[in-house]
A protein has these predicted regions:
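Active-site groove signature of glycoside hydrolases
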Residues: 161-190, 210-218, 238-250
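Active-site clefts of carbohydrate-active enzymes
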Residues: 211, 216-218, 272-299
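Conserved structural position at the C-terminal beta-strand
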Residues: 81-83
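Structural beta-strand segments of beta-rich domains
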Residues: 33-37
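Boundary/entry segment of secreted carbohydrate-active catalytic domains
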Residues: 99-132, 146-148
Length: 300
């Protein structure tokens, strides 16, 4: 006998997620330094290992679905992953293209809400604080928290557990908070012996740690705070991954001034400690914008 069945049958089938790189995003921009390349599980089975390729070259293998790749090459790069499956087959992600930028943004809330860091090709930003902006324009830009002074040290454990890749330490500890007229000048005013005795609080965490950022270049005669800090046997230099520098020249020096800055500040500090250098603040000091000459300096 036969049975006729009429009606509509709907079968719900869950589509397999494509094996792909999830970070960096294709045609996205990331900060130079340590870059997390992430991907999801392959579709065809479990993987015994993953082979990571950057710019067409094999760089390493891992059993994890993330790999930390280091580059300071400001350019567009490519990445793809080869999965070696337990059944002997292989599976490949599509190639993603991503840009690497050294440019960062030091910005407070009043200015930050008015800026679009993506349009400015910024790879990262900081706010002199411990929490990122909630503005959507900053959602894809890496935030780097800062322990501005001893008063914010209680945020270190939260920062470490939140997965931030970097931490900036004390901001201009070699400068006072206020000048003799009571004007705020930005220094956290941390005694160097206090900084030395507190350094253990920063060390040994999952982030890459920056040294305290001095207002006065370590290579200058006046840079005694930083040299004292780094010369202390109580500071394990292996815990310091990079050195942030600030520099404010008194006058605009054009190309010659820029070359002097690179030679006498950046190169000189690197030659002292052989640590990567981050320039986290620089400008001519004068701040005025009322004359054509001042505007030229600021715009330069």
């Amino acid at each position: 006998f036969s049975v006729n069945v009429t009606g509509t049958f709907i079968e719900s089938v869950k589509a397999a997620t494509e094996f792909q790189i999830t970070s960096p995003s294709d045609n996205g921009l990331v900060a130079a330094g340590y870059i997390d390349i992430k991907w999801n599980n392959p579709v065809g089975g479990s993987a015994s290992k993953y082979n990571v390729y950057v710019d067409g070259n094999y760089v390493n293998s891992t059993t994890s679905t993330t790999y930390e790749y280091y580059t300071t090459s400001v350019a567009y790069h490519t990445a793809w992953i080869e999965a070696e499956l337990s059944n002997g087959a292989k599976e490949y992600t599509k190639t993603v293209k991503f840009g690497v930028s050294k440019k960062g943004l030091a910005v407070n809330d009043n200015m930050g809400r008015r800026l679009d860091p993506v349009a400015m090709n910024m790879g990262w930003y900081y706010t002199w604080g411990t929490t990122p902006f909630s503005y959507t324009t900053y959602g894809s830009v890496e935030f780097v928290p800062m322990i501005w002074g001893t008063g914010s040290e209680n945020a270190i454990s939260r920062i470490a557990s939140s997965g931030y890749k970097y931490l900036l330490a004390y901001n201009e500890p070699d400068m006072p908070m206020y000048d003799t007229n009571g004007n705020f000048v930005g220094g956290s005013n941390v005694d160097v012996n206090t900084a030395i005795s507190h350094w253990y609080k920063f060390a040994g965490k999952s982030y890459h740690l920056g040294a305290p950022a001095p207002a006065l270049c370590p290579a200058w005669d006046s840079g005694t705070w930083f040299r004292t800090f780094m010369d202390s046997d109580l500071v394990d230099k292996s815990t310091i991954d990079f050195i942030p520098l600030h520099c404010y020249y008194g006058t605009y020096g054009g190309a010659e001034g820029a070359n002097t800055f690179l030679k006498e500040v950046v190169d000189a500090t690197y030659n002292m400690y052989h640590k990567p250098i981050w320039i986290t603040e620089f400008a001519v000091s004068g701040w005025g914008y009322s004359t054509a000459s001042n505007r030229k300096q600021v715009e330069a």
